[in-house]
């Protein structure tokens, strides 16, 4: 009997081709589009993104073309609790969260996996650019063939159980190859642009979104320098992130950057670019893939944000919940709330949340 797999279909080219590839490999494929948007009226005008209403229609059309069943499932409550509420709270605390990482851990590879198993499926699959591998009885992830599209950074916190029940067929292809496959099999989404914005914030203005959702909780405060001198007024700490230069609304005659955010006093500290370069960080909520615990210092390549290049570093254990990361070269804007992720020979070692 063929193994059954539920493919999370966003209506984009990657998940559409993932469904096709798995069907070609002999799996019994079921397409599921996750309904996560919170306010139907607010999203009616969205033209793209995995939360848009048009994405549902695109996914349905692809499923029909591939001759596979397709369902739309409601994940609103879980998405609000684990992604949106977390996103807002982190910004209110002066941090810079990554909602895609939270969505992967709690929605796509947890809630969707549970629904998939309720349908009798053996696996859940996505269009992520990564490859699941089993090395020495442990599941881990290998970087995608297309390093420009590699998405392993956002998948470091998956559990062994989740990885054991996950398929990512796009990881062995380059993006242009995925688009070519879509063209060859007649999928209308072959030229659909990639979604780059935060899916639940269509205009990408996270500050305005948080202010609208939290109503009167976002307050104006002071910009200060390192000595505590007041430099001017800011719109609210949720509008700013470490290393930010644009959108400060002030002119000092020299390049000025956000070098710290103080949520308890509602202050944003400004300084020079030199002030945001550091070599050390501490990470919490750490998850390792090839092994359970770090038992001795380890040389790795580490990324402090999705778009950054991997940099040489040494990781060592501080206690049961935290690790220290020491980079060989100084890194720009190591930001609380973002994830630091580790690699060795293109294998994902693990990662954690930057705490200090």
UniProtKB/Swiss-Prot annotation:
GO-annotated biological processes: tRNA wobble position uridine thiolation
Disulfide bridges in this chain: 103-199
Active-site residues, record numbering mapped to chain: 103, 199
A cellular-component GO term for this protein: cytoplasm
Gene Ontology MF annotations: ATP binding; tRNA binding; tRNA-uridine 2-sulfurtransferase activity
Keyword terms: ATP-binding, Cytoplasm, Disulfide bond, Nucleotide-binding, RNA-binding, Transferase, tRNA processing, tRNA-binding
EC number, UniProt record: 2.8.1.13
Amino acids binding ATP: 8-15, 34, 127
InterPro entries per UniProt: MnmA-like, MnmA-like_C, MnmA-like_central, MnmA-like_central_sf, Rossmann-like_a/b/a_fold
Region (Interaction with tRNA): 149-151, 305-306
Main location: cytoplasm
Site (Interaction with tRNA): 128, 338
Source organism, top-level taxon: Bacteria
Record's catalysed reaction(s): S-sulfanyl-L-cysteinyl-[protein] + uridine(34) in tRNA + AH2 + ATP = 2-thiouridine(34) in tRNA + L-cysteinyl-[protein] + A + AMP + diphosphate + H(+)
Classification via Gene3D superfamilies: Adenine nucleotide alpha hydrolases-like domains (2.30.30.280), HUPs (3.40.50.620), Translation factors (2.40.30.10)
A Pfam family reported for this protein in Swiss-Prot or TrEMBL: tRNA_Me_trans_M
Localization per Swiss-Prot or TrEMBL: Cytoplasm
Family according to the record: Belongs to the MnmA/TRMU family.
NCBIfam families given in the database record: PRK00143.1, trmU
Its biological purpose: Catalyzes the 2-thiolation of uridine at the wobble position (U34) of tRNA, leading to the formation of s(2)U34.
Protein name: tRNA-specific 2-thiouridylase MnmA
Organism: Clostridium kluyveri (strain ATCC 8527 / DSM 555 / NBRC 12016 / NCIMB 10680 / K1)
Source lineage: Bacteria, Bacillati, Bacillota, Clostridia, Eubacteriales
Gene name tied to this protein: mnmA
